[in-house]
Amino acid sequence: MPTPIYIIEEKKLRRNLALIAGVAAKADIEVILAFKAFALWKTFPIFREYISSTTASSLAEARLAFEEFGAPAHTYSPAYTDEEFDEIVSCSSHLTFNSLSQYERFHNRAAGVSIGLRVNPEYSEVGTLLYNPCAPGTRFGVTADKLPETLPEDIRGFHCHCHCESGADVFERTLAHIEEKFAKWFPQLEWINFGGGHLMTRKDYDVERLIRLMQGFHERYPWLKVILEPGSAFAWQTGPLVAHVVDIVEDKGIRTAILDVSFTCHMPDCLEMPYYPEVRGAQIIEEESSSNLQSPNSNLQSPSSHLYRLGGNSCLSGDFMGDWQFDHELQMGEEVIFEDMIHYTTVKTNMFNGVSHPSIGMLHEDGKMEILREFGYADYKNRMD
């Protein structure tokens, strides 16, 4: 098996897909895959057993939906361009505009698709501003005070995205704001898309609450088709990134295990969010605890503490995270396994510094490993053309 490697576990993927399909059936809604979180098209035959559509935010994603998933996309983009718009329309069943000006500019060229408008309820509980689509000054969506009383006759739906790995309780509170702001326009619509961020495959997610919410919404607005488009929920906890220790260095009492992967290149959300990924067989140590462990006066200060910062193999100074405490001394060549590394990774990786890209594999239910993709010098060179 080539390493480093992202490994998708088919059994876990099917578990998520079955849960999502069950929610869609019980709640009488459509749940579609957001490519921005996961777009490994060689897995699409499995997805098509459970869902029928996907969502795209660019021409490339719309083409992937149409050509590889086999169905036109539900497409939304912050801004369409003249050069790409017609081809996007040809690959889409639904097309949502981010602003009234974009609608006015392009809607006459969107014949044959169901047109939507993104709205902003000015409410979101996402704490990290980088991921909050409703933060003050946002570029996303139209607020209620800017909508005409009567919508243009070809607008068929509203799109509203307010969540990031959120629970059903958050959706319930958000839904109240959406209805308060926009319900008076619902009689003019055919569908509403509540966006992504509904992490229904997380263990503590209240699936039954979500189903009740959607059933209640249907009772109030029986003519509206409801769409959810999560991304992470599909690939949540479906596989790791397997790396290896290539060197161990020490400075000022801090030991760093340098790996053959990069946080910057291969796990960018860890630095952007930021968040500490789970490492198999290791415990995340908070900064204060880490300082105490490294203190000369600490009873735990000894080689047996096995405390390491993990460093990436790019030349970016900040390409590291830590600390983690292991139950043994790390050795050169030893595996370091980052859990839950299938969503928002392969769609965001890069080849900064020419760093080698991990392979991508699938562990099938029968225990056989299939290598879906390996990367080499040609991939780097071709990006530099």
Feature map (PLM): residue ranges:
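N-terminal capping/small domains of soluble enzymes
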Residues: M1-F69, S262, F326-E339, H343-T345
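Conserved, mostly hydrophobic/aromatic
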Residues: L13, K36, A65, L117, ...
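Active-site-proximal beta-alpha core segment in soluble small-molecule metabolic enzymes
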Residues: I29-W191, Y205, L213-G216
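Structured core elements
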Residues: T96, G116-R118, H159, N193, ...
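Feature marks short, surface-exposed loop/turn motifs that line or immediately flank catalytic pockets
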Residues: Y123-E125, C164, M200, F234, ...
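Glycine-rich beta-strand-to-loop/alpha-helix junction loops that act as flexible
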Residues: H161-H163, I192-T201, P230-A233
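Short glycine/threonine-rich loop-to-helix capping motif typified by GTGT followed
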Residues: G167-R173, T201-L210, Q237-A243, D247, ...
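Charged (often Lys/Glu-rich) extended helix/loop segments that serve as interaction or gating elements
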Residues: P230-Q294, N299-D385
